Amino acid sequence: MDSHTVSSFQVDCFLWHVRKQVADQDLGDAPFLDRLRRDQKSLKGRGSTLGLNIETATCVGKQIVERILKEESDEAFKMTMASALASRYLTDMTIEEMSRDWFMLMPKQKVAGPLCVRMDQAIMDKNIILKANFSVIFDRLENLTLLRAFTEEGAIVGEISPLPSLPGHTNEDVKNAIGVLIGGLEWNDNTVRVSETLQRFAWRSSNETGGPPFTPTQKRKMAGTIRSEV
């Protein structure tokens, strides 16, 4: 098991514990509490996958964070926070690509948490790229404005957008929705790749084909999810 995967999980568990204390003191707003609940489910799933106890991981995560804070000078901390807290807005799409109307021959829509996934299931044997406009904080995707799937010819064949009725979404929500979209498109023998910007800030890694690091099992599961909804 990758040690970075384990330490990341441990730190995430401790940070969730800190956020839970904030919520218990009635200091969190609705989106904060919504993300807290969603992240709790995500941590349980990751813990089960990794075979790690959440309580133990939280304790180790606390030690990691305390060590980092102890080693970091006040000046370095101020400089890090000044740069990290500056939210950036990144754009794969032009204004025209974002605002363009598009139509589906075989429309399919699925709600994936607080996000809506739409795609044209009539599209087959195409090379498709996913582009997105989103904000970034702490070098991680913070808020998705809009994601669209484009063919090489520039046609829009899929889309992911936030649901107005469910404000607030996490990085994991976005990745799950992208997985649903990719699974549905690949079911029809399309080849899907993700823009470099989206790979960098959603996954912080990618595979050699330009796609997110989904396993074959995950891809089959995602494709099956879309197929069962048809």
Curated annotation (Swiss-Prot):
Span list, region RNA-binding and homodimerization: 1-73
Places the protein is found: Host nucleus; Host cytoplasm
Keyword annotations from UniProtKB, A to Z: Eukaryotic host gene expression shutoff by virus, Host cytoplasm, Host gene expression shutoff by virus, Host mRNA suppression by virus, Host nucleus, Host-virus interaction, Inhibition of host innate immune response by virus, Inhibition of host interferon signaling pathway by virus, Inhibition of host PKR by virus, Inhibition of host pre-mRNA processing by virus, Inhibition of host RIG-I by virus, Inhibition of host RLR pathway by virus, Interferon antiviral system evasion, RNA-binding, Ubl conjugation, Viral immunoevasion
One GO term (biological process): symbiont-mediated suppression of host mRNA processing
PTM annotation: Upon interferon induction, ISGylated via host HERC5; this results in the impairment of NS1 interaction with RNA targets due to its inability to form homodimers and to interact with host EIF2AK2/PKR.
Domain statement: The dsRNA-binding region is required for suppression of RNA silencing.
Identification of the protein by name: Non-structural protein 1
Source organism: Influenza A virus (strain A/New Zealand:South Canterbury/35/2000 H1N1)
